[in-house]
């Protein structure tokens, strides 16, 4: 062992640093291994472990199978210690798993005998009256015909109902009963139609209310579309019309007369030019 004088502090610090790095690398390697174990299939690992243990009890294992068995045992111990569950595609059928399935067997949904008595009954959305998940089954309370004592003690009013008509109207929808008239011997000459009296006609006219008719009328609106269309003319065209002394919105002169005037003006100019040469 070196004495204190021969100890190099720089070398001691480098050793500590190297040891810390080794511990860090070991931890990272363990984390990566645990992450790989979390993605492994638990059922497949259990199946391989059970097969290798059965094979080991019957015969000796070769080097590869021994190494595989050791790795599986080590991985299973790490998963149990770190509480890593992985995932399961299939499952190993055993007595324990079958017993657990029997104990935790899901119950069938309860269907009441009389669905209409259930408070959850609906003829369209819930015709069986089954309660929703997590809700207890309840039935409707039976309507009792007996009245409460507190309601019986209430005194009835002695007077008539204030909003009731004193003279109720007769019902219009009376049952029709045909009258059976006795046959009478009436001569054709003496038979005359019954004339309606003026009093009955006056009474009928009074009963009929004359409806007042209100008539609404309006005169047609006459619009000058030519004047309105003149607002959309270009400004240069409007100035040209104003220079000619024509109001904006009035129709132009006949096209044929305009063409004739242009021809006459060209002929006059031609004769003026010829007269200058003569």
Curated annotation (Swiss-Prot):
InterPro entries named among the record's database cross-references: WW_dom-bd_prot_11
One GO BP: mRNA cis splicing, via spliceosome
Any one GO CC term of the record: nucleolus
Gene field: saf1
Name of the protein in its database record: Protein saf1
Superkingdom of source: Eukaryota
Annotated region described as Disordered, given as residue ranges: 1-43, 81-210, 240-264
Pfam family, one: NpwBP
Compartments in which it is found: Nucleus, Nucleolus
Native organism: Schizosaccharomyces pombe (strain 972 / ATCC 24843)
Compositional bias (Polar residues): 186-202
Biased composition (Basic residues): 104-116, 169-183
Keywords: Nucleus
Compositional bias annotation for Basic and acidic residues: 22-38, 90-103
């Amino acid at each position: 062992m070196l004495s204190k004088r021969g100890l190099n502090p720089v070398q001691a610090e480098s050793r500590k640093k190297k040891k810390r790095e080794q511990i860090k690398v070991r931890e990272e390697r363990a984390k990566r291994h645990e992450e790989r174990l979390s993605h492994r299939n638990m059922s497949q690992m259990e199946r391989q472990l059970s097969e290798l243990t059965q094979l080991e009890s019957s015969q000796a294992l070769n080097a590869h199978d021994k190494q595989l068995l050791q790795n599986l045992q080590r991985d299973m111990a790490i998963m149990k210690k770190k509480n890593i569950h992985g995932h399961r595609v299939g499952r190993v059928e055993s007595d324990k798993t079958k017993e657990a399935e029997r104990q935790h067997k899901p119950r069938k949904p309860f269907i009441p005998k009389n669905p209409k008595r259930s408070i959850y009954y609906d003829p369209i959305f819930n015709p069986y009256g089954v309660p929703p998940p997590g809700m207890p089954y309840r039935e409707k309370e039976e309507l009792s015909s007996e009245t409460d004592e507190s309601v019986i003690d209430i005194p009835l009013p002695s007077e008539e109902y204030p909003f009731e008509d004193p003279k109720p109207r007769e019902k219009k929808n009376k049952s029709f009963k045909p009258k059976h008239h006795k046959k009478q011997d009436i001569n054709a000459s003496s038979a005359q139609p019954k004339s309606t009296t003026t009093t009955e006609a006056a009474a009928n006219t009074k009963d009929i209310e004359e409806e007042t008719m209100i008539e609404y009328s309006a005169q047609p609106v006459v619009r000058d579309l030519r004047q309105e269309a003149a607002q959309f003319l270009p400004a240069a065209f409007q100035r040209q019309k104003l220079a000619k002394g024509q109001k904006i919105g009035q129709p132009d002169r006949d096209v044929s007369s305009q063409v004739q005037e242009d021809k006459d003006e060209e002929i006059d100019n031609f004769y003026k030019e010829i007269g200058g040469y003569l």
